[in-house]
Amino acid sequence: MGASNLHTPFSTPALKVCGMRDPENIRAVAAIKPNYMGFIFWEPSKRFIQNPIPEIDPNVQKIGVFVKATPNFILKTIQENDLQGVQLHGGETAQDCKVLRDALDKEVGLSKPSLVIIKAFSVADQFDFSSLAAYEAYCDYFLFDTKGKLPGGNGYTFSWKLLSAYPSNTPYFLSGGIG
């Protein structure tokens, strides 16, 4: 499966480019070697990937982005697309993440590194960081995205000063209107 650094906290910023769907664009972005590329497996999204993911550099980790998906759908999608991780973007509870972590660990077994779970949280003018503690045992990374009409990809920026109160050792991604 993937690289051995799947669970290594970032010593330098990591780049995850999300919403890839056009094969030519996927190859072009993969050529610049971001750490991760996100592929949307939520049909209502305008960035929903309908084509098979083309072959890309194995050092670029493929992450499936899911919104309120069942563990069975996620596992099937991982196998069909050789994903190295998942991003949960649909209001999943810590218990949902535990169920998925258990299913992923059972599926992968001891011979391969476990698949990454990234849990996304929508951030508005404030955020209750104490809510993260329940997720820490099951999620490898958090992702903070600006609250908007859609579960993600709204293109808005929240006040990053909120992250100065971040209490966790779990590494995180920053998302929302960055580019």
Regions found by a protein language model. Name each.
Residues 1-107, 114-179:
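Conserved N-terminal beta1-alpha1 strand-loop-helix module at the mouth
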